[in-house]
Amino acid sequence: MVKLSKEAKQRLQQLFKGGQFAIRWGFIPLVIYLGFTRGADPGMPEPSVLSLLWG
């Protein structure tokens, strides 16, 4: 196992926490964004913000 200094361990912990934050709060908006940019399947109506909010 590699010996890491206390400062290096803290930096790695910050990096992992930042990655977890980005994944947790960015996944759903990314999926919604990709859904809007790729468009609907053929034969389906185009998605709109109102249909997203009110079903």
Curated annotation (Swiss-Prot):
Residues 41-55 are mitochondrial intermembrane. GO terms for biological process: positive regulation of protein targeting to mitochondrion; positive regulation of type 2 mitophagy; protein import into mitochondrial matrix; regulation of protein stability. Residues 1-20 are cytoplasmic. It is found in: Mitochondrion outer membrane. It is a single-pass membrane protein. The chain crosses the membrane at residues 21-40. Keywords: Membrane, Mitochondrion, Mitochondrion outer membrane, Protein transport, Transmembrane, Transmembrane helix, Transport. The keyword Metal-binding does not apply. GO terms for cellular component: mitochondrial outer membrane translocase complex; mitochondrion. Changing W25R: Homozygous mice develop a rapidly progressing emaciation after 7-8 weeks of life, leading to sudden death at around 9 to 10 weeks of age. There is lipid accumulation in the liver. Forms part of the preprotein translocase complex of the outer mitochondrial membrane (TOM complex) which consists of at least 7 different proteins (TOMM5, TOMM6, TOMM7, TOMM20, TOMM22, TOMM40 and TOMM70). Belongs to the Tom7 family. Required for assembly and stability of the TOM complex. Positive regulator of PRKN translocation to damaged mitochondria. Acts probably by stabilizing PINK1 on the outer membrane of depolarized mitochondria. This is Mitochondrial import receptor subunit TOM7 homolog. It comes from Mus musculus.
